[in-house]
Amino acid sequence: MNSLEQVKGLIKEEIQAAVLKAELATEEQIPNVVLESPKDKTNGDFSTNMAMQLARVAKKAPRMIAEELVANFDKAKASIEKIEIAGPGFINFYMDNSYLTDLIPTIVNAGEAYGETSTGKGEKVQVEFVSANPTGDLHLGHARGAAVGDTLCNLLAKAGYDVSREYYINDAGNQIHNLALSVEARYMQALGLEKEMPEDGYHGADIIAIGKRLAEEFGDRYAKADEKESYEFYREYGLKYELAKLQKDLESFRVKFDVWFSETSLYKNGKIDQALAVLKERDEIFEEDGATWFRSMTYGDDKNRVLIKNDGSYTYLTPDIAYHRDKLERGFDKLINIWGADHHGYIPRMKAAIQALGYDKETLEVEIIQMVQLYQNGEKMKMSKRTGKAVTLRELMEEVGVDAMRYFFAMRSGDSHLDFDMDLAVSKSNENPVYYAQYAHARVCSILRQGEELGLATGGDVNYKLVTSEKEVELLKKLGEFPAVVADAAQKRLPHRITNYAFELAAALHSFYNAEKVLNQDNLELSKARYELMKAVRTTLQNALAIVGVSAPEKM
């Protein structure tokens, strides 16, 4: 449990104790204590409507109940300085600032661990994201999915979940067949032989490059080889090349996966046959018109789904069912899939499949990522000015940098459309949210360097109770919120809450800096306390930015 959560827990305990002391209700009758943080801080740090909740049981007016609760509340036990009653009976609690100052050494001593919580209780969570076809470059939708997915994984890990990151390689479908034929055509052309590109082939420069490389390395060896042997070679070589490129781009984007899972392995290991056998045994499939159907309507889907077509081939759904069964067999408590908006209609049938296999459909969670629209010079940017094609992850990294991309992609809820202003992303102004947060960190580091010059880094006793000004208290309260923000954002799968928090903490720091002379040679005792406060800000801001995958520069 973290420090601010401890205070909330103590307040709840004291409210319950006050109810019993005032004989307003029995222990069984006490409703769940709800504590909220008022947006207007003049209404306190926490507020409860307990008096209104007790009105029916106590048979008294809420205002009278509130007065009795306040009279029986032990402020000292809950680190509360004062309590006020507002309106019809809201009770507002104001924290004791001396408690807040104890946060400073707590944060500094915790270091990178500050913000960690036990919310997840070690629950095993698998997050599958990106999973783009290995047939070309990653586009902006993939980039946003990568940023949101990786931030969510970092967030879940910080909150005490056991997280596994997974990339599903679609290497068994028709797109890989077309990749192999495209590689073959470019290889033949590089040898000076006539070979038309397949109708649904891949015309990118990377496929031309593969063809030239093959011609240089192998000459005409595969032009003369057995057709089956050469096809397998083109397929494997093209797949290996494209995957290596994807992995390199993702690593440059600071995204690493624990597992790269091959769709082909589901066929080789008999996983598809096993999944179909389970569905058949549970009477979840039937034959009709020469095809095999899944009774997905039983589980809320709008129609039953074909698993095996009348020509004997599988639909896309069949290996997906086998894949999700494999995930569940690996012992994960939760499966989180991050999909593009075009997959929204796919959710009911996947949940139906999981239920039909005998698992709880709520085990699967799907986070939808909406499209990204680039803007430059105030205009929509539909195509890359350099290539005339869709802008890729790699190209945008070169244009605006990884930090800006990671922050911008993660700062809105994934299910909302994102307008990405390229000019804003590279601007050195307070309007640029990533610059604003990073500049706050650099500013803190500058203050700490000044503190070292004043001899404030030598250790010794620190009088934290001197940190009492209005702006200092606001900053301390914001620092204290971080673990609760992590816990709540992780539970609700809302990674953008972390960028919101980083912005708010940066704003509190800038506000304090503009209002106070942080370090004063004429008052070294206060300066020492503020020096430690700045260390706590640096730690917390670093930890927040680390969740988002953004660097925390010491100088800017």
UniProtKB/Swiss-Prot annotation:
GO term, biological process aspect, one: arginyl-tRNA aminoacylation
Domain of life: Bacteria
Stored SMART domains: Arg_tRNA_synt_N, DALR_1
Uppermost EC category: ligase
Catalytic activity: tRNA(Arg) + L-arginine + ATP = L-arginyl-tRNA(Arg) + AMP + diphosphate
A cellular component annotation (GO) from this entry: cytoplasm
Pfam families listed in its UniProt record: Arg_tRNA_synt_N, DALR_1, tRNA-synt_1d
Motif ('HIGH' region): 132-142
GO molecular function, one term: ATP binding
InterPro entries per the UniProt record, alphabetical: aa-tRNA-synth_I_CS (IPR001412), Arg-tRNA-ligase (IPR001278), Arg-tRNA-synth_N (IPR005148), Arg-tRNA-synth_N_sf (IPR036695), ArgRS_core (IPR035684), DALR_anticod-bd (IPR008909), Rossmann-like_a/b/a_fold (IPR014729), tRNAsynth_Ia_anticodon-bd (IPR009080)
Chief localisation class: cytoplasm
Keyword Protein biosynthesis recorded: yes
EC number: 6.1.1.19
UniProt keyword Nucleotide-binding, yes or no: yes
Quaternary context: Monomer.
Protein name as it appears in the record: Arginine--tRNA ligase
